């Protein structure tokens, strides 16, 4: 609260009240409220190594900047989840992710870009970098965080507003104009919504 910012945290294994373990992302708003979004679709390796259970609810989180949606890693690969968030008014999707190799990263990246195009929204991907030797299923990481846009006039060339170097701790900043999304949805080259 003292810094007057909203924080979209990454996700991590969290023990639920009934004893299950879920992968949960937390959102801390500047008004002091805390929101949680469960990962709906755990990966096979999450199920195998950590016995992660999938959540069953996804919805927008109301912020003072408008509604946002959280798609944790693999959830970005399921178009129906993103469409539900877009139908609820989300114009920005946040995708915290943890991939161990370039192939896994590219799946999340390509699907996140598709979600930006399909739903005419912004997608902010933020991934883990560094290695954790001795921690099962977390020993290596591959990430290249980015801020993605629809592919149309008024937006960044190639649908990429900002992109980090691979496997480097860094901060990315981009100005995202939500009125450009309104324009795209009403006047754009394609109108998906």
What spans do the regions from the language model cover?
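Short helix-loop capping/hinge motifs at secondary-structure junctions, enriched
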Residues: 32-35, 153-155, 181-182
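Non-catalytic surface loops within mature trypsin-like serine protease
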Residues: 29, 149, 178-180
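Short beta-strand scaffold segments in enzyme catalytic cores
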Residues: 23-27, 59-60, 125, 144-147, ...
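Flexible mid-to-C-terminal extensions adjoining Fe-S/redox cofactors in radical SAM and related proteins
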Residues: 185-193
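A short, polar/charged loop-to-alpha-helix boundary motif
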Residues: 39-52, 169-183
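Active-site catalytic loop in hydrolytic enzyme cores
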Residues: 14-88, 101-114, 190
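CN hydrolase (nitrilase-like) catalytic-core segments centered on the catalytic cysteine
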Residues: 1-8, 77-169
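A cross-domain feature marking catalytic cores of carbohydrate-active enzymes
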Residues: 11, 72, 127
